Amino acid sequence: MRPPLILASSSPYRRELLERLRLPFEIVVPAIDETPAPGESPDQTALRLARQKAEKVAAAHAGALVIGSDQVATLDGKQVGKPGDHARALAQLHWMRGRTVTFHSALCLYDGRTGQHQSEDVRTLATFRSLSDEELDAYLHLEHPYDVAGSAKSEGLGIALLERVESPDPTALVGLPLIALTTMLRNVHYPLFA
């Protein structure tokens, strides 16, 4: 019998990705502080937040397998967060155009049966096109990507902002690396094809 599988996320994009695996799961939204710690590298931030999300939900769901995930984008050593509004999104896109941004998509699978966890940071390099101010503004008015790191919803129209993507996992850029996740699930003998 499969243990319960829980996605610790409020992200509709992560939910849609997990649905691709056709596994039964539920969603529980973790309430954690997502502020980067002083001196923390972007990959450390993403890994810490993914683990905190999984552990927070696992504490209330004994015996479950809990998936935590977080994504941090970086350029010039600085974290590129969720813009929140049009003006900040436009500023982000101006800064990133013609440049390569690193997206750290961290994943943590917490096994509530054993208290063990597996973590991985899947890095994606996304090179942005050198688009005009008018094109960037039009994109923002059409897509409203104010809730995603880097203002680029690659699962939608945001893919047109990108010139090149390099990643070991094509789902990592959207925020839930499914290749890494299925490897972790196999490691705990969770049946993927049952």
Curated annotation (Swiss-Prot):
GO MF term list: nucleoside triphosphate diphosphatase activity
Reactions mediated catalytically: N(7)-methyl-GTP + H2O = N(7)-methyl-GMP + diphosphate + H(+)
EC number: 3.6.1.-
Pfam families per UniProt: Maf
SUPFAM superfamilies, A to Z: ITPase-like
Superkingdom: Bacteria
Positions bearing the site annotation: Important for substrate specificity: 13, 71, 155
Active-site residue list: 70 (proton acceptor)
Principal location: cytoplasm
DNA repair found in the keyword field: no
GO cellular component, one term: cytoplasm
The keyword Repeat is assigned to this record: no
Example of a GO biological process term: nucleotide metabolic process
Keywords, comma-separated and alphabetical: Cytoplasm, Hydrolase, Nucleotide metabolism
Compartment(s) where it occurs, according to its Swiss-Prot or TrEMBL record: Cytoplasm
Cofactor(s) recorded in Swiss-Prot or TrEMBL: a divalent metal cation
Function noted in UniProt: Nucleoside triphosphate pyrophosphatase that hydrolyzes 7-methyl-GTP (m(7)GTP). May have a dual role in cell division arrest and in preventing the incorporation of modified nucleotides into cellular nucleic acids.
Family per record: Belongs to the Maf family. YceF subfamily.
PANTHER family: BIFUNCTIONAL DTTP/UTP PYROPHOSPHATASE/METHYLTRANSFERASE PROTEIN-RELATED, BIFUNCTIONAL DTTP_UTP PYROPHOSPHATASE_METHYLTRANSFERASE PROTEIN-RELATED
Protein name as it appears in the record: 7-methyl-GTP pyrophosphatase
Organism of this sequence: Ralstonia nicotianae (strain ATCC BAA-1114 / GMI1000) (Ralstonia solanacearum)
Lineage: Bacteria, Pseudomonadati, Pseudomonadota, Betaproteobacteria, Burkholderiales
